Amino acid sequence: MSMVVQHVEEKAVHSWSRISTAGKKALEEALLVFNPMSQDLSATEAQLVAFLQGLRDDGFQPTILRSGDVYGYSSCTASPPSQTKLQARTINPPATSLPARAPQTAKSVPTGQTTLLPVPLSGRLAKGSTPALAKHTTTNLLLSSLKQSNASNTSGTTVGFPAHLYPGVYPAMQLSVVLEALVPLKTPCLDVKHRAQSLQLSLAKSSLKLRKGSGNPQSKAPRRITSKGLKYLTSKGPGAGLRRGAGTQSNGARMKGRSTLGTKTVRGKAPRTLTKAVCARASVAPAKTKTVRVRAKVKQAKPKAAKAKAKAAALRGKAKDKAVQAKAKAARTKHKKRPKGYVQTRTGRTSLKNSSETVGQKRKKAEETKGLPPKKRARCVPRSKARLGTGTAKPQKSQTIKVDRKCSDDEVRQCAQQILRVNLSPVVLLQPLLPV
């Protein structure tokens, strides 16, 4: 039994990939959602099948919906309908044919625009479908039942969902099936002129009609909501009071009137939008002139600011020159106040000496030293610091004597004697006395 369930699950998983290229893309997206990090989609497909089987083993009952159950068209896994049902459907018009009154309304709809007519989804997916799918393109049970109900002219009855044809479809799914059968997947935006006509066609051909009340619907005039309240729109003219019998013609007249009202409102709104655009352009023009004026003022202010900066720099330079000149003058005045002979003594008292006297005294001293004999001259000349005694010269704290291996003891002794001015030689020289 488990083998049969596994086979059904595999068929349910593989059925999407056999429908069309769109089905393959949907399967790939589902597999990527199941395992985003996978690189091999076949492996993830096997994992998905194993996951469903594991849920069933744990006690859960996952409901696997086929494409025919959800969308109402037959896939390759769905069993083809029996020939008895097909023979019963031959009395009704075929699925691809429209009623006799369709060409009259189709002339008003321009080409190149899709309407909300019920179109079988199998026809839209015929390009990417397999050859096996071509056999069942016209066997859409839901659409055939809907068109069978359209053939009957009963207007006061409503047709429900054919639950006997789809026993496993839930109520919420029934709504999705009906919507998918009536409305295409991709409907482009229609113009205002042809929306009412397309709605008329879709409502006239579909089986989902509103129940009509006991009162006459023609007695009610169309209403229009304005700022002041509700207003009833009545037709003016000689045929205002006369109205023809109910039916498709009256409905068509109503829809035409509504479409003309829509076009009139659109035409009335167009000049308003044009006037608004003109006002916006007129308001933009003075703003542009203001910006131009502001830019011109900024350009004029730039050279003024440059001139002000140049003046400030010139004033700073002049101030610096004046400060330098003031310092030079102050230095000159200091030198002028103190003459050359103006000498300050140690006690702090100032005494003025003549420079000529000092020069004469120096000359006299030099002449005296020249005239004296050499002995006296030697006494007058000041002795150097090296020849001065210990009393006059500053005492030396320490003095080093460099001694090498080549230096002898006598040399070291002589160096020490020269430093200390002491004769430390043990050698005593005996000299005879000179005769008198």
Swiss-Prot record:
The keyword Coiled coil applies. Residues 329-340, 373-386 have a biased composition (Basic residues). Residues 95-119, 210-258, 314-405 are annotated as: Disordered. The modification Phosphoserine is found at residue 129. Residues 264-334 form a coiled coil. Keywords: Coiled coil, Phosphoprotein. Residues 105-116, 344-359 have a biased composition (Polar residues). This is Coiled-coil domain-containing protein 71. It comes from Rattus norvegicus. The lineage of its organism: Eukaryota, Metazoa, Chordata, Craniata, Vertebrata.
